[in-house]
């Protein structure tokens, strides 16, 4: 059984049989770790062991983040994939801290702040909008690209999408129409691609917090197990 499957099974055990607080922590960790797959990243065994201590209540989330930071600072034997694992470990711990809170600042500033918090200690440009145009080739589009917004228009575009969503009323619409509307909002926000890196993970975390805040019970399974599918669906939805 590969390491990825083993990680999922361990967290599933907590979710099935653990105390309520342990279930919640395990579900959040599962989501945070699963989201790293959108960039082909995998967490280390050390992160998994440290996450378990947090789930068991032995340490708090800030201690987790400090332990992960110290682990990589003090590591004497470097491995080829250490940089990628370090990113995955730190970002997973950061996302876990964010998703452990029930509050969200549903604004452009709040969205940008999520990027800063998710990538704190990882990217120098965390919390900064890109100041150049980007294109990305996508294998799912046979090497073609999605059209990302010009950098000059980024702030205005985020403002517009969030204000449109803020003005929308979910009252009286069917479940299917709710899903369509939410999908359109999340997809549109992602297409702006305001950051140099980390757009999918930032958008996913922001969406989870927002949906919780308006009373939706968010099933984290999509992000925990199928984050690569989530990203590819966003790419396809924005392909013209």
Model-derived segments and their meaning:
Residues 1-240:
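FIC/Doc superfamily catalytic core
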